C-alpha cells in the first residue's frame, strides 16, 4: 500500500524522525498535541510569505516543562526575523501569550528550496491562483527540482483543470519515485489552490535518494548528493505525453 499512504508517515521511525520531540505522561499528551497544532498554525499565519518548510518543537527536559524550543526552517529567514529582529520578537510575544510558557525561537535558513516538496507545492498553488496553465506549472516545477539535485519528481493536480465542467486528475512524473522502498528518502506535500473555478488539490513527491546503512536523511538531501552505483538512473525527461510520464484519470 505504498502508493496509498502518506510517504512521510510511513517512514517515521525508519529514516525520518518526528517534528515534535517531547516525553510526558499519557494524560498530558492530548493537550500538548493541541498546543503544537496551535503553535504551527500561529507561525504559518503570522509569516505566510516566508516560505516555511518545517516547524520543529522540542520539550526535552522534565525540569523545564514551561520552556518550549521551536525551530522554524524557512527559505526567507529575513521575513521572519525582520529589521533588528523586530518581527521575530513580535512572534515570540504572540507565542508566549498562546502557550503561557517561555519560548525559545530559532530561525534556520533552507539552503535549497527548489527540491523541498512543501515549498514546491506552495509555489505551484500560487502560480495556479495567478491563472497559469496547469501543465506548464507542473513541468516547470519538475525541471527546477531535477536541476536542484532531486533523483525523481512526481506531481498531481486534481480539480476543475482549466475551468472544465468535470473534475479530473492529471500528473507528471520524471525519474524514480520508489514509494514502496522504505529506505528511500521521499519528501511529500499536499496543498490546495483556491482559483476562480474552485479548489485544486496539489500533491508533490520528491525522491532525494536512498538512506544506506551508516547514513542519515541529511546525507541524501545535500545538493547533488551522490547515489550508489547499483541504483538505476532516472529515465530521460519527455514531456510530450506517453504512459511513463503522464497520468490522467477521472475523479470518482
Curated annotation (Swiss-Prot):
CDD domains with a match to the protein in the record:
KH-II_30S_S3 (cd02412)
* One GO biological process term: translation
GO cellular component terms attached to this protein's record = cytosolic small ribosomal subunit
Point to the regions of Polar residues compositional bias.
241-252
- Molecular function as annotated in GO: mRNA binding; rRNA binding; structural constituent of ribosome
Q: Which residues form the KH type-2 domain?
A: 39-111
Residue ranges for the region (Disordered) are 222-252
Highest rank taxon of the organism = Bacteria
Keyword terms of this UniProt record: Ribonucleoprotein, Ribosomal protein, RNA-binding, rRNA-binding
Q: Which family does it belong to?
A: Belongs to the universal ribosomal protein uS3 family.
Subunit (UniProt): Part of the 30S ribosomal subunit. Forms a tight complex with proteins S10 and S14.
**Main role?**
Binds the lower part of the 30S subunit head. Binds mRNA in the 70S ribosome, positioning it for translation.
What is this protein identified as? Answer: Small ribosomal subunit protein uS3
Taxonomic lineage from the root = Bacteria, Bacillati, Mycoplasmatota, Mollicutes, Acholeplasmatales
